[in-house]
Amino acid sequence: MKIKQFIAAVAALILSACSTLKDGEYNLSVVATGDGHGYWFAKPIEDGGRARGSLMAQSAFVNGIRESKGADNVILIDAGDNFFGSGAPFYYNYVDTTSSHLYPRLASYMKYDAVVAGHSDFESGHRVYDRVAKEMKKEGIPLLAGNALSDRNGKPYFPAYSIIKKGGVKVAVLGYTNAANASLMDGSCVSGLRFESLLPLVQEDVDKVRSKEKPHIVIVVAHTAMGKGDGLKLEKQGLDLFKSLRGVDVVVTGHDHANKVMSADSIVVLDCGRTGQNAGVTDIRLVVKGGKVVSRTLDARMTSIKSEEYDTAMEEAFKADYDKVRSFITGTVGEIKKGLVSREFYYKQSDYMNFLHALAISAYPVDISLSATLLIDGKVPAGEVRYQDIRKVYPYENKLVVLRLTGAEILKYLEASYDAWINTVTEPYENAHVLKIKQSKDYSTGKMAWKLAKSPANFDSAAGINYTVDVTKPYGSRVVITDMADGSKFELDKEYTAAITTYRSVGSGGLLKAAGLEDMKSVEDRIVYRGPEFRTILYRYFKKNGSIDPAVVGDPKVVGSWKFVPEFAPAAIKADVELLYGK
């Protein structure tokens, strides 16, 4: 026998031996977490914060299982969304970018066997998830996402699977992110990537891995919602996998923050909840005779994690990190000179909306800003602002997008916005409801109550121009734009740069479609800049300017002006607002 053939034969025997179990019984536990969203610490990082689920509480739970089952019989995996979405990851993602990122160190401390990249992890941006993946690799933990493919070579950007040995048992863990990622976030977050549907990809990968690696147990971890199992929703393919996969023992899902367990024949599926409040556990019993698995039993359950029972040794190990994060979160970033009242936006140009427009204008040299309210009926009080207050000032994770729109398209956009906002009224005006409201049953009281006919999340106003909105005119002729904020001419056939949010850029509210941009390709072709989160913009605005002053953010030479006409309109709309929310 030639040397090469001999070596190959020996290698084959070794591989065969590695895949063959000794006769007997094997008991393993698969512990699954997910959707932690950066709730890492057991104690609050904000002043006045409450105790809640945490990674440290989950660590105590995992420690208990390892003590009872034996550490080598426990597999710890995570379904993603771990380093984006709260104050602690913000600090390590965007403020302290020179130290080692905290999440890989936490995952290493807890001895995770594999972690999936969730949609929010991708939303953090290339700089963040590339850095985290690199540091996790150094810690010996794979960040998996087998359906995130590189445009450059068509191969997975992150590993598709990992092989783990536990108690002599060979376990394959295949990991996938959400197939709808491209539609769930700004394109700059996932530049150079495309996302494949989990069907039929996962089954194809399972078949390849089973053939190549010959595992005894196969686990699929997918950051996808459960869904209905009808195969219709890319974002919700959990039950699709559960119903269709063959040769898989455990399916772990996430994304929708549900707590669900289902089983059928030889497969179980678990959806592990959110923010450290739950963990899924699957006990697997294998009986081996003659080197083959002759019996396989699966028992899956969901367990609530007690927030007060956390890993104190882990807390002590990461105390310096906690102190740094808490110092940042509770530190003063700026001041609001005068309280901002959101409900004023319904009937007039308001300080609150001027502030939102000013943020966009401060971040990029745009001609026009288009934005809706973030607070339906709220107040931003005057006074000192700490970082922990930024979420109250700007409660959503929108990002800035700048695109090119013609004057005619901006006019159509505003017409569509105000058509969702107001009715056309005719004389007599005294009792007219100018705001689009309706009466319907309030299920909390059982009584009839006034409600908005449309969502105010789509009531966009504009800054950078001067215009009026005539409530006596029909749709298509209400908005009259007189000129730009600086007094220059507004032209219908001229292209302007306009600031919008990522919420609007993906077609939400239908305003871009009403403006004439029929599909996402039309929108993508017009985009000239993709900016950071507005919370980051707000943080930077405070660091640069020190305060939000209505006299500054409301400068008419910058934000322009707008109003409802005729004269009765603002008071009539205000009366409608009081029907909704009281005086």
Language model features with spans:
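Acidic, metal/ion-coordinating pockets
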Residues: 19-308, 347, 351-359, 369, ...
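Hydrophobic h-region of N-terminal signal peptides that target proteins for export
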Residues: 11-19
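Intrinsically disordered, low-complexity segments enriched in polar/charged small residues
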Residues: 9-10, 228
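Sec-dependent signal peptide recognition
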Residues: 2-9
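A composition-driven signal for long, intrinsically disordered, charge-rich low-complexity tracts
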Residues: 5, 174, 504-505
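Catalytic centers of hydrolytic enzymes
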Residues: 21-29, 33, 38-48, 52-64, ...
